[in-house]
A protein has these predicted regions:
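Helix-turn-helix
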Residues: 8, 16-50, 54
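Hydrophobic alpha-helical connector segments
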Residues: 54, 68-94, 144, 148-151
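Generic hydrophobic, amphipathic alpha-helix propensity
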Residues: 5-13, 30, 55-59, 63, ...
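Amphipathic alpha-helical packing segments from all-alpha helical-bundle domains
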Residues: 61-64, 68, 112-138, 145-149
Length: 166
C-alpha cells in the first residue's frame, strides 16, 4: 500500500507537470491531486524536493537502461545513436511532464539539487553517445565528442520547442 501511494503521488506530479498553466505546484495541490492529505504526503516523502528527485530518478533510470541495452547491441554505432535519440524523444513525448523537468522549467530554486541532477544527466547521456560514436570514429565527419554535443544540444532544443508548442 505504501509503495502504491508513493507511485500515485509521483504519477500525480507527472500529470501536474504536463499542465503549462499551472505555474507553481504546491504540496497542498499535489496532495489534493493525489487524493491524500498533505500530512500523508510528508509520510512518504520528507520534502517536495525529494518528490521531484524521485520522479527524475524514474526518468533517469528509464533512459539509461535503454542506453546500456543499446551499447551491448551488435548494431552499428550510427544505428545505436539514432535509436538512443529516437527513444529519448519518444520517452519525452509519451511522458510529457518530464519535458518540463528535463528543461528545468518546472524547478524552483528549492529544487536546485534536482536541477544539478538534470545537468549531470545530460553530461552522462553525452558521454554514452561519445562512447558509442567512438566505435565508428573513422566513419564520422566530426569527432565523436562534437557529434555527441550536437545530439544532446538537439535534444535539449527539441524539448524546449516541444514545451513552447504546448
Amino acid at each position: 500500500m505504501k509503495k502504491d501511494r508513493k507511485n500515485i503521488i509521483l504519477q500525480s506530479l507527472a500529470s501536474m507537470l504536463e499542465d503549462r498553466n499551472l505555474s507553481k505546484i504546491t504540496t497542498a495541490l499535489l496532495a489534493e491531486k493525489s487524493g491524500i492529505t498533505e500530512a500523508a504526503l510528508y509520510r512518504h516523502f520528507p520534502s517536495k524536493r525529494s518528490i521531484y528527485a524521485e520522479l527524475f530518478s524514474f526518468c533517469d533510470d528509464a533512459i539509461f537502461a535503454k542506453c546500456n541495452e543499446l551499447k551491448k547491441n551488435k548494431m552499428s554505432a550510427k544505428d545505436k545513436t539514432k535509436n538512443a535519440f529516437v527513444f529519448f524523444m519518444m520517452f519525452v513525448e509519451k511522458n510529457k511532464g518530464f519535458a518540463r523537468l528535463l528543461s528545468r522549467e518546472a524547478l524552483s530554486t528549492n529544487e536546485q539539487n534536482v536541477s544539478d541532477n538534470v545537468n549531470q544527466f545530460y553530461e552522462r547521456f553525452e558521454l554514452i553517445l561519445r562512447q558509442i560514436l567512438k566505435e565508428d570514429a573513422e566513419n564520422l565527419t566530426t569527432q565523436p565528442g562534437i557529434s555527441a554535443q550536437l545530439i544532446v544540444t538537439a535534444i535539449e532544443g527539441n524539448i524546449s520547442r516541444y514545451i513552447r508548442s504546448k
